[in-house]
Amino acid sequence: MRATVCLPTYNEKENLEPMLRALGEVLVPGDRVLVVDDSSPDGTGEIADRLASELPFVDVLHRPLKEGLGPAYLAGFWRALADGAELVLEMDCDFSHRPEDTRRLIDAAAGADVVLGSRYAPGGRIGNWGLVRRIISRGGCLYAQALLGLRLRDLTGGFKCYRREVLERIDLDAIHSRGYAFQIETTYRALRAGFRVVEIPITFVDREVGGSKMSRSIVLEAIWKVPALRLAALRGQLR
């Protein structure tokens, strides 16, 4: 099945070229990488354009504003669907997600509708995170599990693979999450729609180049968004 990897970028000039070249080593003919750049002031968008002219599997989508992870992914999803992708992947550009693991997610999609690259599934692990970041991540997953009644272990991770049918069925226009709540919301909507979601273990390593995008507003959004999703589901308003 033809896959498109959506790669959102904001100030990733050091990481973009090595990431794209690494993905080129593991993707197969017909697969694409879509760089979704939010007008990075460091010139990431220009680097993406140069690489798209050199690497035949790379496309670039320029967005005029930095609006957050969720809107960037949604724009990428619509573009990938319009271009005929059968599988659509999310991953980070900073090497937190290993390029070679994209193949594992794609292969796992043969038996599932959504595949989560899981830090907390048996065999998964996290490298070089401090205690506070580990607590925030694990606590966020447990919080979402409890309120939404889910057994999946990693609900906030951003390494995912969707079958085309999932993105066509869930109401993408109703998704307004900007930060990591986006990951919880898309998975929850897929489950509510009856799709099969599985986890495969990955090794997650924090970025070595560039700055983290984590912020207080991202955490606060997830805190209120999770109960809002549960309430919408109880009212029959979630698709």
Predicted region positions:
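Hydrophobic helical membrane-anchoring modules
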Residues: 1, 149-150, 172-239
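Short, well-formed alpha-helical segments that are part of the catalytic scaffolds
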Residues: 12-26
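Residue-level signature of catalytic and energy-coupling elements of molecular machines
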Residues: 23, 76, 94, 163, ...
